[in-house]
Amino acid sequence: TRIIPPPREKPENHLLPQKRLDKTRVLIYHSHTSESYLPVSGKTHLHNGRGDVVRVGESLATKLREVYNIQTLHCETIHDHYPFRDAYKRSEQTVKQLLTENPEVEVVLDIHRDATPGLDHKVKIKGKTAAKLILVVGSERMGLQHPHWEKNYSFAKSLLEIMDRLYPNLAHGVILAEARYNQHLHPQSIIIEFGDDKSTWEEVSYSIQLFSEVLASYLNLNSTGYSM
């Protein structure tokens, strides 16, 4: 089934969701809260603290709320303090609690930034440079129970299709990983990486603007009314 976004002449109006503002539709959190951008903070990580990715999450949440009236919950809890290997275990507990408190959430996003050597994360879109995105979907290949992974994968591919129609080349694509990355907790849960450790804030901020429209388009077309 092809997903065709609505006309784009008036994004402020045609992307307004039909749900009440007080219903939380999007949950944003960070398993690797310390991740940062060298041009922004001078560091790749703000260890035991809130790195630049938290600013990304808050900026995206603000766009969704203020531009598209999509009620969004942004969690700033630090998850990757020592020992760092337990970051996903900690964020799993956070997400479980937040979904219990907000069972109507339709989309769960774990916001990161990439650091793959040699991968170009810059793309020109309408004359401005944006930081490219990567969508990461977990699976059950490591043997852990993950009943939703195919739904997560379908969700990511739907976002990518809208993205490619609205803003071609904004994303590198969808990566299907072996670990489940807490995505077993919700059928529309993915990781999104905004740029890499060398991205500037201007590039990342532009990507946030573009992606917020993509996500709003998806939600407007696919109102699920989840109750976990």
Model region roles, listed by residue range:
Residues 29-34, 76-77, 138, 195:
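Short loop/turn segments at strand-loop or loop-helix junctions that form parts
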